[in-house]
């Protein structure tokens, strides 16, 4: 990690942006952000309750942790350039998760969609 942190700031802005987008796509899938959040409600609805608690309560936090440790620290220039786009995606996640949760009858799907909304707040705070 230290080697990457030393090399990436010296690279061109376009290369930094490619690295940033690559990491962000991976971490946005893990931390369910719109538009790549669709795996969470379906997975939590069919999983056992204990597994759903781990999915929604613990494992999804890895995505936001990765955003902080990898995206912000390794590519600070690209992170600064993309902050408005990330904030827009975060607000869309907040609204989409909240509105989608209102129409759910299954408790685990409801929790999953509120989790999408909560992760939108986390990403908004990060950027």
Locations of the language-model features?
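Hydrophobic transmembrane alpha-helices and their helix-loop junctions in integral membrane proteins
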Residues: 1-127
């Amino acid at each position: 990690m230290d080697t990457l942190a030393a090399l990436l700031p010296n690279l061109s802005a376009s290369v930094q942006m490619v690295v940033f987008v690559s990491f962000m796509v991976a971490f946005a899938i893990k931390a369910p952000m719109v538009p790549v959040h669709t795996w969470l409600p379906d997975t939590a609805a069919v999983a056992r309750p204990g597994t759903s608690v781990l999915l929604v309560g613990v494992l999804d936090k890895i995505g936001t942790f990765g955003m902080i440790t990898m995206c912000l620290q390794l590519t600070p220039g690209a992170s600064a350039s993309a902050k408005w786009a990330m904030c827009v995606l975060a607000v869309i996640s907040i609204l989409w998760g909240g509105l989608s949760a209102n129409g759910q009858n299954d408790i685990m799907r409801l929790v999953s969609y509120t989790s999408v909304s909560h992760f939108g707040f986390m990403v908004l705070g990060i950027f």
